[in-house]
């Protein structure tokens, strides 16, 4: 039975309370098989005990009670043993339970432990062994559970552990062995789970580990082996997951490793083997993923490596083999990706290499082989890419020694394009029709916020000004030689006549929306997670749209404060911020004092010809005379580029998560509306200076003003201090929202209004010096970071 047939064939399970649950065909077949086995067991042993005919329909304990005598720790058992032992423990619960079972041994043991809960439970099982053991542990929970199972062994063991949770669970299973073991571990969670499975072995093992999470899960599977092993490791996460699969082996192994994440995942697959192995490695991430695949083998292996990322991914594939191998390497990234492919072999291999990047990618391909190989090389990049091709082979082989900078050319691809010359092919036509229905407003000025369901008044303030293709990191939605609208080969283009907003544009806006919801570290990890879609904006939109409702709700929650300030114009008063009044003298200054300080800062910057963006980024007073003498925006930006401001910004801050031109292009046409508002306010600044009785000085022009706000945005130390002091605001991760927020007005301590950006400059100055009205700050620098760390 193929994958689609298995998806279509479903049954309904009537639960014990009369509820109905849709089950897959495999699970229905499993329950029926278990019913028949249970009936055979009941018939064979009727002279001894009457067992229920089904695990789902009745309380078997009550029905069998008249035939069986009860034991001290067991209920209606034949040839069963239930033991519970507690020795020298404090606040410890040890439980052993056996119900309606034959030839069952259930044991729970706790030794020399504090605040430990150890439980072993066996229910309606035959020839089942369930063990839970905890030894010399503190705050440790060890659980072993077996339910409605035949010939099942379930074990959970924790030894000399602290704050460790070890769980082994088997549910409605036949001939299944499920084991979870933790040895000499601290703050370690080890889990092994088997659900509705036949002839399945699931094991999770952690040995001499600290802060380690090891998980092995098997769900609704047949003849499946799932293993997760961690040995002598620190801060390691090892996971092996198999879901709704048949004859599938999923393995994740980590050995003698530090800060390593090793994951192997198989979902809705048949005859699939997925393996992820990391050996003697430090700071290594090794992942192998197979999704909705048949007869597919996906392997990711890292051996004796440092700071190495090895990934193998197969998605919705048939008869596909995807391999990524890294051996004896340092700072090496090896990736093999296969997406929506049939009979496709994708391999990436790196051997005894240093600082080497080897990638092999196959996307939406049939009968395609893509290989990238690097052997005994240093500083070498080897890439092989096949996209939306049939019977295509793309191969790059760098077999060199020494400081090689090879394979910088486009991959040589042998592609048979004849079958794709017809744009009206049925596949392309159906895909185009489906996308047009999903994004119906692309003939108008649609944006991703409309797609998510935001109202026009909300979109006005959440709008992604300045977000363009340069927002995307290099390599994300930026492939050349393909359709600019969908990034597909021209013969497979899914764009349609009259489309004003491209799918690629919606995709980069969707990426910006995801950035709205993530801090720097979370966004880095997200970019790694979507690596299979880096060359496929249409595929990414499909992935993004699945979480459409969730994303909408999350934005509404996280940005409620922002919309209240920018849309409903709720007033920010510094006196409402308790932390601000206690931790900063700026929050006790009058509006006049804040303005005086703002103009003084700019007067000093102009006099010293200090580079503005760098100063507000990290208080660095580098000189840049060309910036102050620039007559137009172009010359201004060229001056910044000449002194390396943009390069330093990318290397020091989260600006490195965008394309190299992103910040530079903010000085072009992106913020015309905000620029108009600022230039209209210049007259107000002159009147303010006259009213304050100070000598009028030239206020910063637009490009200098924008430099200030960009520097403040990427200044991590300043941002954290401001968000701590000003309690009405919270974290935000997009520059356009920061620019909008900076221009709202706030009430100073004397209830006079000042722009928020003036308050920002005052806080920034407070973090650096005591050069403020009324002398020295008396409480400043409560949060001051003398190291002034910037960015990520």
Swiss-Prot record:
Residue ranges, annotated region (Disordered): 113-417
What GO CC annotations are associated with the protein?
Answer: cytoplasm
Which N-terminal stretch is annotated as signal sequence?
none
- InterPro entries, per the entry: RLR_Helicase
Map the sequence repeats onto residue numbers. 91-102, 103-114, 115-126, 127-138, 139-150, 151-162, 163-174, 175-186, 187-198, 199-210, 211-222, 223-234, 235-246, 247-258, 259-270, 271-282, 283-294, 295-306, 307-318, 319-330, 331-342, 343-354, 355-366, 367-378, 379-390
Q: Which UniProt keywords apply?
A: Repeat
Q: Where is the composition biased (Basic and acidic residues)?
A: 394-417
Specify where the region named 25 X 12 AA tandem repeat of N-[SV]-[RS]-T-[NS]-A-T-T-T-[AE]-[ST]-[IT] lies, as residue ranges. Answer: 91-390
Q: List all membrane-crossing ranges.
A: none
Q: Which domain of life is it from?
A: Eukaryota
Q: Coiled-coil annotation: which residues? A: none
Provide ranges: composition bias, Low complexity. 118-393
What is this protein called in UniProt? Uncharacterized protein YBL113C
């Amino acid at each position: 039975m193929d994958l689609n047939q298995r998806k279509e064939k479903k049954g309904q399970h009537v639960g014990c309370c009369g509820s109905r649950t849709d089950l897959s065909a495999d699970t229905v077949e499993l329950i029926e098989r278990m019913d028949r086995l249970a009936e055979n067991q009941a018939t064979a042993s009727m002279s001894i005990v009457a067992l229920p005919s089904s695990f789902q329909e009745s309380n078997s304990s009550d029905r069998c009670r008249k035939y069986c005598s009860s034991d001290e720790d067991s209920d209606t058992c034949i040839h069963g043993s239930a033991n519970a032992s507690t020795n020298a423990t404090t606040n410890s619960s040890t439980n052993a339970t056996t119900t309606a079972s034959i030839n069952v041994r259930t044991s729970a043991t706790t030794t020399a432990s504090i605040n430990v809960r150890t439980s072993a439970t066996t229910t309606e099982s035959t020839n089942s062994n369930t063990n839970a053991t905890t030894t010399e542990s503190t705050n440790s929970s060890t659980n072993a559970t077996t339910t409605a199972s035949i010939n099942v062994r379930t074990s959970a063991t924790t030894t000399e552990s602290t704050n460790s949770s070890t769980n082994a669970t088997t549910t409605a299973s036949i001939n299944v062995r499920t084991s979870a073991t933790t040895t000499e571990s601290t703050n370690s969670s080890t889990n092994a789970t088997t659900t509705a499975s036949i002839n399945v072995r699931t094991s999770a093992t952690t040995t001499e580990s600290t802060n380690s999470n090891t998980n092995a899960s098997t769900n609704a599977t047949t003849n499946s082996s799932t293993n997760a092993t961690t040995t002598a490791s620190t801060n390691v996460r090892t996971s092996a997951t198999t879901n709704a699969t048949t004859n599938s082996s999923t393995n994740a192994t980590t050995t003698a490793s530090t800060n390593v994440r090793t994951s192997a995942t198989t979902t809705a697959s048949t005859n699939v083997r997925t393996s992820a192995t990391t050996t003697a490695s430090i700071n290594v991430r090794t992942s192998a993923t197979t999704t909705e695949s048949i007869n597919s083998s996906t392997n990711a292996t890292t051996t004796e490596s440092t700071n190495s990322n090895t990934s193998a991914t197969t998605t919705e594939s048939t008869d596909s083999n995807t391999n990524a191998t890294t051996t004896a390497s340092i700072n090496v990234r090896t990736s093999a990706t296969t997406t929506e492919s049939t009979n496709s072999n994708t391999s990436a291999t790196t051997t005894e290499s240093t600082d080497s990047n080897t990638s092999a990618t196959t996307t939406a391909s049939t009968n395609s082989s893509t290989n990238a190989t690097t052997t005994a090389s240093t500083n070498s990049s080897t890439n092989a890419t096949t996209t939306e091709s049939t019977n295509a082979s793309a191969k790059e082989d760098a077999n060199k020694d020494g400081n090689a900078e090879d394979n910088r050319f486009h991959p040589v691809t042998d592609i048979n394009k004849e079958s794709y010359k017809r744009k009206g092919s049925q596949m392309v036509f159906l895909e185009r029709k489906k996308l047009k229905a999903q994004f119906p407003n692309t003939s108008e000025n649609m944006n991703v916020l409309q797609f998510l369901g935001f109202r026009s008044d909300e979109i006005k303030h959440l709008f992604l000004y300045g977000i363009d293709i340069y927002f995307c990191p290099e390599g994300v939605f930026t492939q050349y030689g393909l359709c600019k609208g969908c990034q597909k080969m021209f013969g497979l283009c899914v764009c349609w006549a009259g489309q004003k907003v491209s799918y690629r544009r919606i995709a980069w806006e969707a990426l910006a929306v995801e950035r709205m919801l993530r801090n720097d570290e979370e966004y880095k990890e997200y970019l790694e997670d979507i690596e299979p879609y880096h060359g496929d904006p249409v595929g990414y939109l499909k992935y993004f749209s699945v979480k459409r409702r969730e994303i909408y709700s999350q934005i509404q929650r996280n940005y409620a404060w922002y919309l209240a300030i920018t849309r409903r114009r709720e007033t920010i008063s510094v006196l409402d911020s308790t932390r601000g009044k206690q931790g900063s003298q700026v929050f006790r200054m009058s509006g006049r004092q804040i303005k005086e300080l703002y103009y003084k800062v700019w007067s000093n910057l102009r006099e010293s010809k200090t580079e503005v963006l760098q100063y507000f980024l990290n208080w660095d007073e580098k000189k840049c005379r060309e910036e102050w003498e620039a007559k137009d925006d172009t010359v201004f930006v060229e001056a910044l580029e000449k002194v390396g401001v943009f390069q330093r910004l990318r290397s020091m801050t989260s600006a490195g998560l965008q394309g190299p031109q992103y910040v530079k292009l903010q000085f072009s046409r992106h913020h015309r509306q905000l620029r108009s508002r600022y230039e209209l306010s210049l007259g107000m600044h002159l009147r303010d200076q006259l009213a304050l009785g100070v000598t009028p000085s030239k206020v910063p022009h637009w490009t200098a003003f924008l430099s200030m706000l960009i520097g403040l945005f990427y200044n991590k130390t300043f941002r954290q201090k401001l968000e701590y002091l000003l309690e009405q605001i919270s974290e935000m991760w997009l520059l356009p929202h920061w620019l909008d927020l900076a221009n709202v007005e706030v009430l100073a301590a004397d209830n006079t209004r000042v722009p928020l950006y003036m308050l920002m400059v005052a806080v920034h100055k407070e973090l650096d010096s005591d050069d403020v009205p009324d002398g020295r700050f008396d409480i400043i620098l409560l949060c001051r970071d003398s190291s002034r760390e910037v960015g990520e």
